[in-house]
C-alpha cells in the first residue's frame, strides 16, 4: 500500500494553536480523520496557559473581539459555542493611563465614548466620529471581504488595488489618527492597536484601524478560564469528531512526494504519519525553513525569509499576589500604561533594536473578572512590554537583561498603577523573546510572526495554500489574514474553503465485484 493510499481521508495538523485547532475542527466536519500534533503539553499554542501556586497565567491573547467568528465555527461543526465556553462582555473595554495623569477609558456604549472624547478634547469629537466612520469602511472591506477569502492568486490582489487606493492604505495607522484628531492622548488611543498584532503604528497600513470597528461592533469579551478554555473546548470537538490530539510530540519534517505533493509528516522519533492533507499551524518561517528544509523552494527560500520584517518581541512578566483582591480598586481587567515617549519608543523597538529605559505596558488582571484565575482573595497579573526581536546585530542578551528589565517594569507599575505590589508577589514566570523562540519556534522570537506592513499583508504573506507544496496548507499569524484571535480562527476557515470534502469510503457492496444475475448468465 503506497503512502498516498494510506493517507487517503486523513489530515494532519501541525500545531495546536487556535488556527490549527480551527482548521482541524473544520476538516473533521468535512469527514477527515484528523490528527493534531503539538510539542506542548496542552492545546492552545500561544493561547495556552500555565498554572503555578493556584494562579492561572494566560500566556498570550486575553480577549475575544469577534465572538461571532467562534460561534460560526462551532455551528459549522454542528455544535453550540455558548454551551462549551462562557464569554463575559467587558465594560469598560480598557483604560489607558498616560504619564501626565490623563486617562482615557474605552467603552462599548457610544454615548460614553463621545463623552470621554469630549472631556479630553472637545474640539476632536467630530474628528473622532470621522475616524470611526473610516474604521467601519476598512472593516467592511478589509475584514468582511478580504479577510474572509483566500489571497492566493495575483489577480486577487490586482482587483482590490483601487479600493486600497481609495481607502488610503498607503497611510499609516498613526498618520490617519493624526489627520483626524489633534489631541495626543486621542492620537495614541486611536493608533496603538497594531501593537497587539505585532505592528509598528507609524508604518503599518491604515487598513488596520478596522480594529476600532471590531471593538465597536462586537465588543470586547473575556472567556472564563482564559483563552485556554476556548482551546480546550476546540480540542474536545476534535476528539468528539473522532480526531486525535497528540501532545508532547514534535514534528521533524513534512513529507513530500517526488511530484511535489505533501504525503504526511515525520515525527522526531522517526514515526511517519501519512495524510492526504497537511496543515501547518507552525510559524510560516519555521514551516518553510525547518519542516521543508530538504525541499527546493522558489518563493519562500531561506534568503527571502531572512529579508522579511518580523514583528517585535515581547517581554511578559506573569505574577500572582497574595491577599490583594480588595486592593487597587481602580485597576480593572485591562490597563495600558503609556510611557513618556511614543514614536521614539516605537522606533527603538522596531527600527533600532534597542532596549529603552522607558516603556509602555499592557497590564492584565483577570482575577477581577474570573474567580478561576487565582486563589480566593488573591490576584493574577500579566504585564506585557513590547521589546525588540532577536534579529538585530546589537541584540539583547536576555540571560543578562531579563532580571534588570523586570526590575524596571516593577518600578513603573509600582509608581503608576500598583503601589506596594512587590511585597505581595508570591509566584512569577517571565517570558522573553528567547522563550518565544524556544517554546513556540518563532523566528527571531517574534511575538506575532511577520510584521503586518502593507507589502507583508494579504497576497504578500505566505499563502494559505502553500506555493511550494501541493496539499500543504498554512494557518496562523504568519499567513493570511494575519495575527489576532479573529484572524487566526479565520485562517482555519480559509483553508477549509480550499480543501475538498474527504473522499467517502467505499461500501462493501460498492467495492465488491458485481455478481452476475441468473438472467445475465443465461444470456451469455
Swiss-Prot record:
Its cofactor is FAD. Its EC number is 1.3.99.28. GO terms for biological process: carotene biosynthetic process; carotenoid biosynthetic process. Residues 507-524 have a biased composition (Low complexity). This is Phytoene desaturase (neurosporene-forming). NCBIfam families: crtI_fam. Transmembrane segments: none annotated. It comes from Rhodobacter capsulatus (strain ATCC BAA-309 / NBRC 16581 / SB1003). Belongs to the carotenoid/retinoid oxidoreductase family. Pathway: Carotenoid biosynthesis. It is an enzyme of class 1 (oxidoreductase). Residues 500-524 are annotated as: Disordered. PANTHER family: B-CAROTENE KETOLASE, PHYTOENE DESATURASE.
Amino acid at each position: 500500500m503506497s503512502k498516498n493510499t494510506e493517507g487517503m481521508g486523513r489530515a494532519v495538523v501541525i500545531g495546536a494553536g487556535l488556527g490549527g485547532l480551527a482548521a482541524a475542527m473544520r476538516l473533521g466536519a468535512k469527514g477527515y480523520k484528523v490528527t493534531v500534533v503539538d510539542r506542548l503539553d496542552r492545546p492552545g499554542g500561544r493561547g495556552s496557559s500555565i498554572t503555578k501556586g493556584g494562579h492561572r497565567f494566560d500566556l498570550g491573547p486575553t480577549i475575544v473581539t469577534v465572538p461571532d467568528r467562534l460561534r460560526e465555527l462551532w455551528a459549522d461543526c454542528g455544535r453550540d459555542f455558548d454551551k462549551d465556553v462562557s464569554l463575559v462582555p467587558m465594560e469598560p473595554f480598557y483604560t489607558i493611563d498616560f504619564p501626565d495623569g490623563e486617562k482615557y477609558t474605552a467603552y462599548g456604549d457610544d454615548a460614553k465614548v463621545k463623552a470621554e472624547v469630549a472631556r479630553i478634547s472637545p474640539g476632536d469629537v467630530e474628528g473622532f466620529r470621522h475616524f470611526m466612520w473610516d474604521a467601519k469602511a476598512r472593516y467592511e472591506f478589509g475584514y468582511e471581504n478580504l479577510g474572509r477569502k483566500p489571497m492566493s492568486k495575483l489577480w486577487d490582489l490586482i482587483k482590490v488595488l483601487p479600493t486600497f487606493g481609495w481607502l488610503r492604505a498607503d497611510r499609516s495607522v498613526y498618520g490617519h489618527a493624526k489627520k483626524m484628531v489633534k489631541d495626543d492622548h486621542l492620537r495614541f488611543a486611536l493608533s496603538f492597536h497594531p501593537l497587539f498584532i505585532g505592528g509598528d503604528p507609524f508604518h503599518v497600513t491604515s487598513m488596520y484601524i478596522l480594529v476600532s470597528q471590531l471593538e465597536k461592533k462586537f465588543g470586547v469579551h473575556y472567556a472564563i478560564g482564559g483563552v485556554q478554555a476556548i482551546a480546550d473546548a476546540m480540542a474536545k470537538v476534535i476528539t468528539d469528531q473522532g480526531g486525535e490530539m497528540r501532545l508532547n510530540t514534535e514534528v521533524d519534517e513534512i513529507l513530500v512526494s517526488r511530484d511535489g505533493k505533501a504525503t504526511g509528516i515525520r515525527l522526531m522519533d522517526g514515526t511517519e504519519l501519512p495524510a492526504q492533507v497537511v496543515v501547518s499551524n507552525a510559524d510560516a518561517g519555521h514551516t518553510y525553513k525547518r519542516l521543508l528544509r530538504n525541499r527546493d523552494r522558489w518563493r519562500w527560500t531561506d534568503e527571502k525569509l531572512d529579508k522579511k520584517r518580523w514583528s517585535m518581541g515581547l517581554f511578559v512578566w506573569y505574577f500572582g499576589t497574595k491577599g490583594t483582591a480588595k486592593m487597587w480598586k481602580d485597576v480593572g481587567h485591562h490597563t495600558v500604561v503609556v510611557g513618556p515617549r511614543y514614536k521614539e519608543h516605537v522606533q527603538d523597538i522596531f527600527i533600532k533594536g534597542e532596549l529603552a529605559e522607558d516603556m509602555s505596558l499592557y497590564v492584565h488582571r483577570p482575577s477581577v473578572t474570573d474567580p478561576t484565575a487565582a486563589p480566593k482573595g488573591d490576584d493574577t497579573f500579566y504585564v506585557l512590554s513590547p521589546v525588540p526581536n532577536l534579529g538585530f546585530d546589537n541584540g539583547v542578551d536576555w540571560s543578562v537583561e531579563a532580571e534588570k528589565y523586570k526590575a524596571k517594569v516593577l518600578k513603573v507599575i509600582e509608581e503608576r498603577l500598583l503601589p506596594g505590589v512587590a511585597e505581595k508577589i508570591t509566584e512569577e514566570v517571565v517570558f522573553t523573546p528567547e522563550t518565544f523562540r524556544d517554546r513556540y519556534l518563532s523566528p527571531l522570537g517574534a511575538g506575532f510572526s511577520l510584521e503586518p506592513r502593507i507589502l507583508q499583508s494579504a497576497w504578500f504573506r505566505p499563502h494559505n495554500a502553500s506555493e511550494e507544496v501541493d496539499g500543504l496548507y498554512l494557518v496562523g499569524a504568519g499567513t493570511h489574514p494575519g495575527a489576532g484571535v479573529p484572524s487566526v480562527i479565520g485562517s482555519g476557515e480559509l483553508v477549509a474553503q480550499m480543501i475538498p470534502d474527504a473522499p467517502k469510503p467505499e461500501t462493501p457492496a460498492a467495492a465488491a465485484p458485481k455478481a452476475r444475475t441468473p438472467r445475465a448468465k443465461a444470456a451469455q
